[in-house]
Amino acid sequence: MNKIILLLMFCGLPALAGCTSEKAKAAFTLDTAPLTTKNVDAVKGQRATCAGPAVKTFNLEAIETNVNLGMGISFAAWTYNGRIPAPIIEACEGDKVVINMTNKGTTAHGFDTHAMKIDARHYSPVAPGKTMTIEKVVDTPGVFMYHCASGPVTDLHIKSGIHGAMIVYPHKGQLRPAREIVVVEDAVYGVRDDEGFIPGTDPQLAQKNEQAFSMFNGRMDNDAVRVNPGDLVRMYFVNVGPGVSSAHVIGTLFDRVYDGKEPIVGVQTYAVPAGSGVLLEFYIPEEGVYPFVDHDKLAFLPYGLSLAFATGNISAMAH
């Protein structure tokens, strides 16, 4: 892709949207190719999503299946559509979002999104073989978690892998050109056998928030995300838990953090509570490796809880 060096002039913004100012300038490379990891697809982005139909329908299936976590470890998980994390849901502010959730499992499952303002009774459990439909206009831009809703055992379902990220883009104001990626932090609560298989979530470990592994995007072995010096990376980040995630990129700062209407500028580490999402933007300042980590869980390095952004053919293990 051709790269054009631009001067971007920026100032305080409405929710998630960009504007310009002569007081602050930053050079960046206009490369907007989306970024991905093994378990997460590329986002469509604000422009394509908001140009689409005003009614957006998403079909989810609750599936109980074994998933590969990498590094020789597999897990008997509960999922949406057979994957951890679940498919990305993208909508535009003002869209009506329709969710059809079919339970193909052997126990009750459900659906709950933090992006909707709706009577909680709509999030009741769904029996095996049944389908629920939830529809609502989403009116608040942001990054949100969605997950299974199964009454008193909802926590166990979430910790078994049935969760995902939902993005609601602002209808007015364009986001800055950037390389976009979704990152979900989650954990596994179970004991693996001699062959590396974890036969489901251990309720006692889950109750105590004692995770065996913490991961980004459901993998212990994410490859380095390839970027270029000068790239602006926009990360739609969701923290499933447990506890607060201390989001940090080793080697650079967050240029902007969006966790409400106005951006926070020049942030070294940002606390994201369990069950919450945030938009994080950072530049790749020069050739090198820039690991994204949870600074509160460095004990889980290098097993899953590091996602390296690296330029060229530089080894992601350099740090």
List PLM regions with ranges:
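Secretory targeting signatures
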Residues: 1-22
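Copper-binding active sites and cupredoxin-like electron-transfer domains
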Residues: 19-319
